[in-house]
């Protein structure tokens, strides 16, 4: 829908307060009356845009394991999937706007978490449970491990991107950082005897 696309582009670039319904109508090439026919207020349009963005950003399936999977390769593939989702521009923009507008729209942080990070935590937890099932890893608490892995992968690169800061030149490249995270997680949960 053109109105939603226009609202998303404007809100994510400028924030809630700096965008008017007139701007949204112009960008969507519709009349202001058409915008109000679909969304009775800027607040409702904003909330709908955030809900939509939260849901669309976290689609996708994580790699699946089998009994003979190369766990290090699968762990790398899985953490790369997580990293790409967490550090891509749109999820970072949505996160920024939720942090800025959360006090004004208290339902948005819960919706964001429930439609964004929580499904990712569940998918990663399922991955660790599969790894346990096939004895590829020994993860005592898959849910906790999933949350810790997400924060590890997001880490210093994510916070710098969130703040629109450059990553220092002496910081490891993203791929090297990811390899380090894979090795750290593997060593933490390597089954006895491996």
What are these regions (language model features)?
Residues 1, 8, 12, 36, ...:
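Solvent-exposed, non-membrane alpha-helical residues enriched in polar/charged side chains
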Residues 84, 88, 93, 97, ...:
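Amphipathic alpha-helical packing segments from all-alpha helical-bundle domains
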Residues 41, 104-106:
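Short loop-to-helix capping motifs
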Residues 77, 81, 118, 122, ...:
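C-terminal peripheral helix-coil segments that are non-catalytic and often amphipathic
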Residues 5, 72-88, 92-103, 143, ...:
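Amphipathic alpha-helical segments that line or abut small-molecule/effector binding pockets
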Residues 2, 6-44, 48-49:
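Helix-turn-helix
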Residues 49-78, 84-86, 90, 94, ...:
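Amphipathic alpha-helical linker/stalk segments
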